[in-house]
Amino acid sequence: MRRWLCRAVLIAAALFVADLALAPSIRAAEKVDLLLVLASDVSRSVDAEKFKLQREGYASAISDKRVLDAIAAGRNKRIAVLFLEWSGVGNQKVVIDWTPIDGAKAAQEFADKLLELPRAFADRTSISGGIEFAVAQFPRAPFAAERQTIDVSGDGTNNSGRDVTLARDEALAKGITINGLVILSDSPLPWNPEHTNPPGGLDGYYRNNVIGGAGAFVMVADNHDSFGQAIVKKMIAEIAFNPPPRGVILR
């Protein structure tokens, strides 16, 4: 009898340990319609006022009814979002980790948190570093999705780290789509005008060097004041997977 009890206890303990081991994988299999990394430029060209407008724009967009309607129209009726900030080489930080957005409450909580948290960096502009860091976030997402997208916003060209096209191509090889949100500058930087206003325009630079993958596109915000509305349009297109024709730049 005692031997039988010991065996029963051991079996129960083994099953309990197995359940604990399975729990993370079960959570990892929870399905969403999209894994979306919002990668925000906080380099030196983004001053305090521009930074404030960017954060407010993202917060407003994630909780916008039109964005929530697009989420609700998906098969799983939710997406997972991660928000990170990047600037120079080695300067990347997850500001808000993977969060499921499945309605107004979750979206508002995400938005409120985004408005509260401090700025991560203010350095040079390594778009390549931002992309590499964003790519590394997908394998640890506690959700599963058929689509993985990096949404890169920025107001200048890559001037730090390795060639941005190398980072882009590595992301595309993993099946990740990169979209761009270009923030145009009213006037070029006095000390480096081609950083914010390169030949062919910053939108052209992003189209040729940054974006790629299924349905990739560039959205343009004419300035930081119009950033909020631009990110709303961009997120709706990404969530609904309704991109513009290839090569078209949206405003």
PLM features: residue spans?
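Acidic, polar low-complexity linker/tail segments
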Residues: R2, A18-V37, S43-K50, A144, ...
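Von Willebrand factor
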Residues: E30-V95, K105-S153, V182-W191, P198, ...
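Second-shell loop/turn segments in exported
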Residues: A39-E49, V81, D97, K113-R124, ...
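C-terminal "exit" segments of structured domains
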Residues: V218-R251
